[in-house]
Amino acid sequence: MNLTETPEIVHWPEVHYVFVEKTGPFMQTAPAAWGEAHRLSQKLLQQHRIDRYMSLYRVGPQIYRAGFGIEGPTAHVPEGLRYEVFPGGKYSRFVLTGPYSLLPQASGRVFELVQQLGIELRDDFNIENYVKDPRVTPAEELVTEILVPTA
């Protein structure tokens, strides 16, 4: 697995975020949330430009959000999607290069590294930022940033 094991401290920017939220085990909720989000994205694109694809998740209560960063604030999103401003903040960033099927293993390793390195976390969403477009990028060349909220 091609995962950076030394994190980079970054300040994640504020994001106008449109998403589908699911609760429960991520192995079931993540694919379901992304399926709905992708289905609804065509309606979203009729009114907004998508800047980024990203998921936000909390491990404790098992909240998973699949969604899109858009260019600015909005009062209207397609039915089935929610909108909020994600404030961003300080994060420790790890980078996975390879297929999305490695994300569960990579995320587990990231949380092991957080403990081993003594990274102090704050209570906020973790982020998966999907850097390359999977429609045009071979799976082994996909890049995903895994970011943990850092105190």
Where are these regions (language model features)?
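A solvent-exposed interaction/effector surface
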Residues: 1-151
